[in-house]
Every structure is written in structure tokens, then in C-alpha cells.
Amino acid sequence: FLTLPEEQQMLFEKIAKRTDNIVTVVISGRPLDLRRISEKSKAVIMAWRPGTMGAEAITDLVYGITNPSGKLAVSIPWCVGQVPISYWDIKTGHVLTADNLENRFTSRYMDIPNTPLYPFGFGLSYTGFDISDVEVRMGQDKRVHVHCNVSNTGNVAGAEVVQCYYETSVSYTHLRA
């Protein structure tokens, strides 16, 4: 199941009827359909599998003792139907450009957004950060080197995850399992 168990959903609804000041902590090993939870929560913390010190770490986040700096390693779907069963697509060489954005998907939902509720790499903080002077170069070792400056623009101490992604536009090799 990609939703919360019915008992937990019922408990959440009872709490939501009494207050709108809700911070939801989700402890799960996979992305869930959290749309209803997200709509009624001031914040959602994806704690995943936090381990033995998880309660203390989560408490520090909720009370502002520690500044959150994590980013999602998966997308949180808008609805269960957005979760693919498999992803075996081969890159076709049809590069996504500003001219063909509408044709990126061959089928789409008509009644909900075609985007996730929270995308891969999403994460909030109690402060802001500015990433500047980004420099990308290929080294003599044939590795890509990325350098940048990160500045905290807020009043709260924090750490930022600098996200850098690479994708080939054409697959030259089809790997078989």
C-alpha cells in the first residue's frame, strides 16, 4: 500500500478537526501518497527509518534546535497512480526543449497535476541559502569537477545540500538484467 493505514488516517482526521497547527512526522521506508496529510499539515517531516536516536533528532527539528537540511532522495507522488511499476525506458534521443515541453509525456492525468507532490531533491530549511559562482569543468582525469560558493542568507545557522545532477540525452547501450 502506498497510503497510510486506515487507522492512522482516521486518527489524523480526528486531530485535524481539533487543530490546524499540525506537524506530521512520517516514518516509512518508501514514498507514500501524502496529499491529504500535506494539505492539513503546517509541515511534513519525512523521517524514513530514523534508528535509535531518531526521536531525539526529530524533536530537535520540530522545536527548531536543529535546522533541517535533508533533501528527498525520491519523489513523493501526488497520487498512488503516479508511482511507476517499472522504469525500463530507453532514452530515445528526443531531447526535452522549451518547444516540446507539452509533448514530454505521451499520456497524462486530466484531473490532477502531472508533477509529484514533492519532487526528488525537495527540502526546506529554517534559513535561506544562495549558491553562486558555479563552475563546471572537465578535468584531465576525465572527471567533471563542480565548484561553487554557498552563503547562508538567513539568521539561523544551517547546512545546505548542493544538488548536482547529470543525465545523458541519448542512451548508447541497452543494459539487460
Residue ranges and their predicted role:
Residues F1-R176:
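C-terminal non-catalytic regions of proteins with extracellular/luminal or membrane-system context
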